[in-house]
């Protein structure tokens, strides 16, 4: 059998999920403490990029798009990420702020999905975070007109060296086209893999100022 033939056998790739379950008595009254516990466990397990999350948006035709970004802050007000404001996702959020986030912690047989509304961060919040980044990352933010078409990587590298020279003295200024978003938590779903595909799913949903918790069928 050729390598290509083996690749075509993906329908037979499967495994049992045996790392544990999630029961109602394990659940706090609000979702954030459980999210924080799972995130801490993902970090402690040395997962690659435990703060990586998929951000799903839609364009004006209803076409969905997904990409991975890094979570940079979270609290009761929502989950925060930063991006180029000229990017496709930023334009789509401007037209439709309803987004979905997904944390795929495969090695722990866990997923967390968030549904909420994205809102722009204040300039003060963005400036504070921007200047906490490594200096080369600050310069890199100036280089790319995100999602635009370019003919070669060399264009980016040349621009980076040019701007590194330009900003060699003093602080790198915040680009006017760079910012961040906070995604409110309207729903948060926790998924824990289970044996025989009997996975555990619990959905937290805001209900008149409180949190309603439902178990969902896998």
From Swiss-Prot:
Q: Which domain of life is it from?
A: Bacteria
Q: Which UniProt keywords apply?
A: Flavoprotein, FMN, Oxidoreductase, Pyridoxine biosynthesis
Q: Which InterPro entries match?
A: Pyridox_Oxase (IPR000659), Pyridox_Oxase_CS (IPR019740), Pyridox_Oxase_N (IPR011576), Pyridoxamine_oxidase_dimer_C (IPR019576), Split_barrel_FMN-bd (IPR012349)
| Cofactor dependency | FMN
Q: What Gene Ontology biological process does one annotation of this record name? A: pyridoxine biosynthetic process
Looking up Gene3D superfamilies in the UniProt record yields: Electron Transport, Fmn-binding Protein, Chain A (2.30.110.10)
Q: Enumerate the catalysed reactions.
A: pyridoxamine 5'-phosphate + O2 + H2O = pyridoxal 5'-phosphate + H2O2 + NH4(+); pyridoxine 5'-phosphate + O2 = pyridoxal 5'-phosphate + H2O2
> Does Flavoprotein count among this protein's keywords?
yes
Which leading EC class covers this enzyme?
oxidoreductase
Pathway this chain belongs to: Cofactor metabolism; pyridoxal 5'-phosphate salvage; pyridoxal 5'-phosphate from pyridoxamine 5'-phosphate: step 1/1; Cofactor metabolism; pyridoxal 5'-phosphate salvage; pyridoxal 5'-phosphate from pyridoxine 5'-phosphate: step 1/1
Amino acids binding FMN: 67-72, 82-83, 88-89, 111, 146-147, 191, 201
Record EC number: 1.4.3.5
Entry binding sites for substrate: 14-17, 72, 129, 133, 137, 197-199
Give the co-factor note.
Binds 1 FMN per subunit.
Gene Ontology molecular functions: FMN binding; pyridoxamine phosphate oxidase activity
The role this protein plays is: Catalyzes the oxidation of either pyridoxine 5'-phosphate (PNP) or pyridoxamine 5'-phosphate (PMP) into pyridoxal 5'-phosphate (PLP).
Q: How does it assemble?
A: Homodimer.
Q: Which HAMAP family has this protein been placed in?
A: PdxH
Q: Which family does it belong to?
A: Belongs to the pyridoxamine 5'-phosphate oxidase family.
Q: What is this protein called?
A: Pyridoxine/pyridoxamine 5'-phosphate oxidase
Q: Which organism is it from?
A: Klebsiella pneumoniae subsp. pneumoniae (strain ATCC 700721 / MGH 78578)
